[in-house]
């Protein structure tokens, strides 16, 4: 990756929070991916990264739906502040 395309760690984390908000608002990795212009696989990887960073699941995953967990619910106001 060349320097003009490199993201700072802070920027990367803001992107992860924006993706988190998109998944929470749409309830879907696929629809969130469309909103943030990424592949569904990239969105899933970002959510797994976020969960590793905070040490807890942020979503309850069910067939066809993503619902905020208690940890995700607590994270949401902070995510909105940083986006």
What is each stretch, according to the model?
Residues 21-37:
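Short helix-boundary/capping micro-motifs
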Residues 34, 52, 73:
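Alpha-helical residues within the helix-turn-helix
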Residues 1-12, 18:
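A detector for short, charged/polar N-terminal pre-domain segments
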Residues 13-16, 40, 72, 79:
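The N-cap/first-turn positions of alpha helices
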Residues 35-36, 47, 54:
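Core residues of bacterial helix-turn-helix
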Residues 53-54, 75-83:
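Alpha-helical linker/hinge and terminal dimerization helices associated
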Residues 51-68:
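A short LG(V/I)-centered, amphipathic sequence patch enriched
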């Amino acid at each position: 990756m060349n320097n003009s395309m490199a993201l700072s760690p802070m920027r990367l984390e803001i992107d992860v929070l924006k993706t988190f908000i998109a998944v929470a608002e749409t309830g879907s990795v696929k629809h969130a991916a469309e909103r943030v212009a990424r592949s569904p696989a990239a969105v899933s990887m970002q959510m797994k990264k976020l969960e590793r960073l905070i040490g807890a699941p942020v979503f309850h995953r069910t067939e066809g739906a993503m619902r905020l967990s208690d940890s995700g619910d607590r994270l949401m106001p902070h995510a909105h502040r940083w986006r």
